[in-house]
Structure formats: structure tokens, C-alpha cells
Amino acid sequence: MSFTRWEVFFGLSVLALTMPFSAGVTNLRDVSAINNLYITLGAPSLHHWLAFGGDPCGEKWQGVVCDSSNITEIRIPGMKVGGGLSDTLADFSSIQVMDFSSNHISGTIPQALPSSIRNLSLSSNRFTGNIPFTLSFLSDLSELSLGSNLLSGEIPDYFQQLSKLTKLDLSSNILEGHLPSSMGDLASLKILYLQDNKLTGTLDVIEDLFLTDLNVENNLFSGPIPPNLLKIPNFKKDGTPFNTSIITPPPPPVVDPPPATHRAPPVPRIPPVSGVPPAPFAPFAPLQPQQHPPPSPPLVWSPPSSDNGGGDPWNSVSGQPTLQISPPSGSGSGKFWSTQRIILVVSSVAIIVLVSGLCVTLWRCCRSKIYNRYYSGARKDLQRPYFNKPPSQPTPTMGKVSREPMVKPFDGYGAGDRKYGYPMPQRAEESRRAMPPTSYYNKDVNTPQKPLQQPPRQFQSNDTASKRAAHFPPGLNSSSSATVFTIASLQQYTNNFSEENIIGEGSIGNVYRAELRHGKFLAVKKLSNTINRTQSDGEFLNLVSNVLKLKRGHILELLGYCNEFGQRLLVYEYCPNGSLQDALHLDRKLHKKLTWNVRINIALGASKALQFLHEVCQPPVVHQNFKSSKVLLDGKLSVRVADSGLAYMLPPRPTSQMAGYAAPEVEYGSYTCQSDVFSLGVVMLELLTGRRPFDRTRPRGHQTLAQWAIPRLHDIDALTRMVDPSLHGAYPMKSLSRFADIISRSLQMEPGFRPPISEIVQDLQHMI
């Protein structure tokens, strides 16, 4: 049998192409799944684990157990693993055991899980959200451990298909509600841990299960404990307020009226109070006689109904008057009326307390207005590109102040987070060349400006207007003052707030370039009408006072303000080179000036700004929206961080739209100083790679810069390939390695593992 030349060539080609994949032992599907798991866990320090490729079975990756070529077990308990889990867990072909317990994994439990799983242990982590309903599809599941997390909501009613489940641990979460009825279908269940939750209702659902261990401590269960549960060998119920009084005993048997001879004993009868004969005998059990009646007992009697017939009630045989037992149609017993009085008193007190609480709440709301409606959450900034347009000549006439509607989120005072791929205007380079040199603005702005129609008033930072809860040190730069501008003067400087002078726009407000006489420039932020409506004059002045205290070399300086005719504006120093985002992604001429040393100095300047906010200010000031568009560059490429102290004015935005800067915990409403550190790490990644933090034009898996870069930071070959090509290799390898290490520590998924900002500043200073 002979082969033609092309057949031999084809066979060798196929062999060469398949050799890299056939060399490994592990199923390629499992390799891809564990690579994705490694990435979502934040690239932890696990022996042999890789983000791409590898042979988990052949190389015996840490915690991995295989059967032939398939991964069947992954056990990494107590390895200090962070990050989160994703739906790619379902890609494992035949995995049976996943033990990720006692780590720092956060986020929600993924909806997609491998159908072959038998033992799933996620206990002692930081999972949040609800228990996913898709667990009902795991018919082979025998052990499920979700204890010691932050899971909330009710336990879903989906246990019908989990007939093989023998252990269920839901302890130490924030679960509430009743036990689902399908939990009674768990015929194989032996161990059930529900302690330390907020579960309510009764335990009747599980009374027929053959349990050996049951722990319901520290819950809110009520009702009697079913007798079958009391027979469980290991039954713990301390701290749960079981209330056996809500279940009434069996009703007493109906007793026929005794014969007449039994009514004759000499028992003192209680005459009717109103002279009406007692109600006829009703088939109720008589009251038991009191053995030791107290002297002169009070007589509690209910007024009999006028339609009561004749007959004698049963009385106590002890000679002491007792309460008459009336039929349901009567007026009720004395005990009944006593209970009503108690209920009436308690209800009255409760109503008084509720009304008082409502009054206090309304009073406090009137004081604070709606300030607390705003919190700084995640938000997506889609802002125009910042570019320096040629100065416009002021118009000879003055028009009314423009009232722009609220627009897309604002970023920096120029150069916001625009839609990626936004073209740089052709005249941008010409405009930049037309800008004044570094000394574009002198510090004599605090003196009255000649164009002002009214003499400027000095606003001292120790004002007494609206002393709100400020997040700034009260004594910092207490002598600072700001120039009070008039609307007329700012109209003149900004060409009547013309669109040509807009250098940024967003939800806080539009930013205009203001040209003063003698070629000086300012940046004027005109707060949106939405902010003006929700902020009083006193609150605005307090904001100005607080921002004035944030005066350091790397914080964008507030120079003045305007508060006239319902309009509020903040006047900042002007940075002619725009933002770092412009320099990296839009301005090619400026990009060429970003040498390695310049980039390290920019990272150091940004870090020092955050160090001032986090560690000098008491209490600390969290920026909450730190990104490359907030890092402005002056004429010497020195850093000025914008929007410091304005976080509370930002409306809530979905964290999924934060363009790759948001730390994982921000998704759940937690924003701390360490969240700023994570955002700084992303900015340093931009400096290292020249890539955008999020780019939809790239392949899936490469779109989010942090997710793509983290696994490569400790691989020297991959690290050199990811450096910005415009540097042309002009950087020391030792400096590159140190910078990558700083970035890697800043991008830890767990906030507690990220270094304090002072440590980052110190490490960057050692690189200079």
C-alpha cells in the first residue's frame, strides 16, 4: 500500500498540529475549565496551576485528583484563595468533588454548576446573594456545604430531585423565612445544620426525616418540637424560642348535663348581677374547684345578655364565687374582659410609640432633606474627550445662564471616560499647541480680577453654614479662602457658557474652559440642575469649605466658586495637558512623552494624592471614582487628581459599567480606601500596557484589562510582551518586575490583602 506525496504531507501536518494537544494527559475541556477557574480565583499561589494550558493530571496540580484523563476532584480548602466563581464551573466534564472551603472567595454562587458534582463544599467563605435554584438539577449531589457565608433570602423550594443528599449545611448565614415543603422529600438526609440564621415557622416539615444530626440553634422557630425530632441522637436547639403555647391541647370531652339530683348539693350560687337569670347550661367543661381560696376574693362578672334563658351555671364546689361559663353567644367571661383590657393598654402604648417614632423620623428627614439619598456607588462615565480648543473670544453681549439638562456621567474636569474608540478631533493637536506654557496661571487668582463687575468676596473655610457630617479633617488648612466669582464674569470668561468651551460633561455637571485676561485659564464646573435642586446653599458652601481643605501638591486645587441666581459653579485650576487617559489613548504626540520614568512618576504622584486622602485626612476621604481620566497632567506632566471630595454627589450607577476600574466588593455596595487602591492598580496597568481598562473590541477574555493581565504579571516572558509597545523596550527589567509586583498586590481580589497606600508610595519611591 503506497501513499502519494501529498497524503504523506497531509498526515505529517495533522500530526504536527495535534501533537501539542495530544502530549498532555488531561481532557482539554477540563484544562480549559480549570484555567478559567484559576483566573476567576485571582491567580492564587497554587502549585503548577496556570491560566493557560498545562496538564493538571499529568503534572499533578495541587489539589487536583484525576481518573484517567478527567479531573474528578478539586480540593483546595484553607489555601487563602480569593476572587470568585463563575459559570465556567459547568465546563468540567466529570468532576465529582469541589472543596473550596475556608478561603476568602466572594461574590455569588454561580447558577451554572457541573451536573456530575456529588460533593460541593463552599463553607467558610464570603459568598453573598441567594442560594441558586439550579442546585435542584444536581441529582447526584450527596453533600452540600454552604455554611459560614453571607447568603440571604429564603431557602428555595427545590429539594424534590435531590434524593441522594445525605448532608446539608446552611448554617451561619442570613437566611430567613420558613423551611420549604420539599425539604421533607430528602429521604436520604442524615445531617442537617441550620443554626445561626433567621429562620421562622415550625419544624413539622422535617419531622419524618431519618436524621442523626440536627442543629437549629439561634433561629426564630416557634411552635412545639415534633416528638420525632426529640429522638434524634444529636439534636441541638439552644437559642431558639420554641413556643409550645401556640398549640392547644385536645379539646375536653363534651359532658352531658348531670341529673337533677346532682344539682342539689349545698353549693352557694352566685346571683345574677343584673337580676336576669343566669344563661342556660352550655356544653363546656366546668372550672376546677380552687383548693385554697383567698379571703374576700374579688368578683369579676360579665354582664349577661338580655336574651339569656333560665338555668343555672356550674359554680365552684368550694363555696367561693367563681366566674360563670357562658355560651359563645353570651357576653364573655371576666377573664376574657381582663385580656381585652391588657390588649387595649398594650395597643394604646404601641400606637403612642409608633406615632412618636414617626414624628421623630419626619423631623430628622426635614433636617437632612434628601442628602442621604445619594451614595457613591459604581457608575459608568461616558464623557466627551477632553481636548484643548483654541481660545474663543468673548461675545460683546451677555445672555442668560444656560441650563443644560443632566447629561452622561462626568469624569475629571476634562477628559472623561468617553466611549472607547471616540476619535480625537483633528484640531486637537493645533489646539494644544495654542495653549499657554506651563505658567498658564498665577496664584494671584485670590485677588479681585479686573473683569469682575463686582468686587470678589473672600469666603473663609471656617463658615458656620450647614455643618453637615463632612468627611474631611476639620482643622486642615483652616485659613484657606476662595475667590467668589459672579455669574456675569464667568459668562464672559466662558463665552456665555458656549458649547465650544465645554471640555467635559457628566451627571455632576458640565465643565467649561474659562479664558481670563492675559492668557490665563481656569476650569469651571457648572453643577447640574439636579444637584442644585437637592442641595441647599448652606450645604454647597460647606462643600466648598471642605474641598478647600484638600490642598496638596497632587490634588486639583479649588480656586473659587459662584452661587448666584440658583446656579452653583466650582472654579478649579486648569491643566493644559488634559488627563492621563488622553495621553495614553488619544493624544499621540503626548503619548510619545510618556517614557518609563515619566510613567513611574505619574504613578507615584497619583499614589501620593490617595495617600493624602486616606492617611492625612481624618477621617479618611475615599475618592470612590479613581481612574485615569481623574489623573490630570499639568504643563510639566505633574499629576493633579480631580474630583476629590465630591463623591457624595455622584448618583448610584451599576458597577458593571465602571469600565474595569471597580474593585470586586463595590458590586455589593462596599467602598473603602482599599477599593481606591484597586482602582489605582488598574491605572498603573494602563501605564504599563498602554491598554484601556475595558475594550469591547478585543476578544472575549481580553476585554477587561485587570482580568487579562493578572495571570501574566509574574511570568517574565508574558510580562515583557504585555508592556506598551511604544516604549520600544526602553525600561530596566528590574524596574519592570518591581512595578508588576506593586500592581499585582494592588489588584488582589480580597480588600484585606491589598497593601495600604503608604506602602505603595514607598515602593514606587524606591524605583525613582
Swiss-Prot record:
Changing S545F: In sub-19; loss of function. Residues 25-341 are extracellular. Residues 363-768 are cytoplasmic. Keywords: ATP-binding, Cell junction, Cell membrane, Disulfide bond, Glycoprotein, Leucine-rich repeat, Membrane, Nucleotide-binding, Receptor, Repeat, Signal, Transmembrane, Transmembrane helix. GO terms for cellular component: plasma membrane; plasmodesma. The keyword Metal-binding does not apply. Residues 248-283, 291-301 have a biased composition (Pro residues). InterPro entries: Kinase-like_dom_sf, Leu-rich_rpt, LRR_dom_sf, PRK1-6/SRF4-like, Prot_kinase_dom. One of its GO terms (molecular function) is ATP binding. Glycans are attached at N70, N119, N243. PROSITE patterns: PROTEIN_KINASE_DOM. It is found in: Cell membrane; Cell junction, Plasmodesma. The protein kinase domain is catalytically inactive, but nevertheless important for SUB function. Interacts (via intra-cellular domain) with AN; this interaction is not required for correct subcellular localization and recycling of SUB. Binds to QKY and POQ at the plasma membrane. Binds to QKY at plasmodesmata (PD) in root epidermal cells to promote tissue morphogenesis. This is Protein STRUBBELIG. It comes from Arabidopsis thaliana.
